[in-house]
Amino acid sequence: MREYKLVVLGSGGVGKSALTVQFVQGIFVEKYDPTIEDSYRKQVEVDGQQCMLEILDTAGTEQFTAMRDLYMKNGQGFALVYSITAQSTFNDLQDLREQILRVKDTDDVPMILVGNKCDLEDERVVGKEQGQNLARQWNSCAFLESSAKSKINVNEIFYDLVRQINRKTPVTGKPRKKSTCQLL
């Protein structure tokens, strides 16, 4: 079974943990409890293929920056999350993306831009078109709006990253084990 290392990044309070826990455990976490770093594993089926996802839920961008290079280096796919209710969280993502590309030393990194908390439409300050435009600027990066609370597009975030990783590095046929027979 193929393993995928996915990393969820963004400013504090955008709902990174809420999205991750909703995806992995099917629970909405109401209380805000700042994360240092949590790792989750979940087996899923994407396009008929069994996958083991290892999801790293990270601290907000303003905290624990020293750890960031390491998980950017090891991550295969990245969800860059902002809150549609806070413009500053959207603005923070450009630097984060540039850091990922610098650490990975390539422009071709599986990535999805996520506008979270879309259930709070009456508190929206970041328009959907702003997210779409930024995703286009980022080499046609995938874009979704989501809500961990209302379970909108939660699974799609992680499945999309798996599909991007599969397109970038497809699994070839399983290498056959070479067996040798020795007669003594």
From Swiss-Prot:
Coiled coil: none annotated. Keywords: Cell junction, Cell membrane, Cytoplasm, GTP-binding, Hydrolase, Lipoprotein, Membrane, Methylation, Nucleotide-binding, Prenylation. One of its GO terms (cellular component) is cell-cell junction. Residues 182-184 form a propeptide. A motif (Effector region) lies at residues 32-40. A lipid is attached at residue 181 (S-geranylgeranyl cysteine). The modification Cysteine methyl ester is found at residue 181. Its main location: membrane. InterPro entries: P-loop_NTPase, Rap1, Small_GTP-bd, Small_GTPase, Small_GTPase_Ras-type. One of its GO terms (molecular function) is G protein activity. It is an enzyme of class 3 (hydrolase). It comes from the Eukaryota. It holds the Pfam family Ras. Probable GTP-binding protein that possesses GTPase activity. May play a role in endothelial cell polarity and endothelial barrier function. This is Ras-related protein Rap-1b. The gene is rap1b.
